[in-house]
Amino acid sequence: VFGRTLGDGVLNIVVLAAMGITGFVVGWRPSSGPVMITLGFLFLFLFGFAMSWVGVLIGLAVKDERVAQNATFIAVFPLTFLSNAFAPTTGMPKPLQYVAEWNPVSTMVAGCRELFGLKNEFGATAGSFPSDNPLLMSIIYMVIIMAIFIPLSVRKYNNAANK
C-alpha cells in the first residue's frame, strides 16, 4: 500500500510540474522567491499524498474500479466546490461560508496563495483562525487525514490480503 501511494506521489510530481509550466505559459507569475515557490509545490505534493490515502481506502472498500472512481469523485466534489478554490466564499449562504472556512481545501488554497506570494482572499470569514493561519491549518489537516486514513487503509489491505 505504501508503494502505491509513493507511486501516486511520483505521478503527482509530474502533474504539479505540468500545472506549473502550463500556468507560467498562460501568464501566472508568482511574486515570492524560489524558496517560497518550492515550498508551495511541496505543500501541494504533501496534500496530494495525504489525500491519496483517502483514495486508497475508497479503492480497497469497493469491488469495482468504476465504483471507486465515482466514490472518490463524490468525496472530492463537495470539498472542492465548498471552498475558496474557484470563488470567494462571500457569495455563499452563511452556513456554507463556515463550512468553507474550515474546509481543508480552502486552507490549502489560501496557504498556497500565500506561499506563491499572491493575495490571500479567503472570503467572508476573514479574521477567523483558518483564514489567518491557513498553512498551520493545512498541516493539521494533513496530519489528521494521514493519522486516520493510513492505519485504516493498511488494515483494510491486510484484511483483504489475508482472505
Question: Which role fits each region the language model picked out?
Answer:
Residues V1, T5, V67, G91, ...:
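Residue-level recognition of oxygen-bearing side chains
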Residues F81, F86-A126, L136:
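Short hydrophobic, aromatic-rich alpha-helical segments embedded in or entering the lipid bilayer
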Residues R4-T5, G9, F77, A100-P104:
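Transmembrane helix-bundle signature of multi-pass membrane transporters/permeases
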Residues F2-T72, N133-S153:
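Alpha-helical transmembrane segments and their short interhelical loops
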Residues F73-L82:
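Small-residue-rich segments of transmembrane alpha-helices in multi-pass membrane proteins
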Residues F116, N120-G123, F129-K163:
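Junction motif at the cytosolic side of a transmembrane helix
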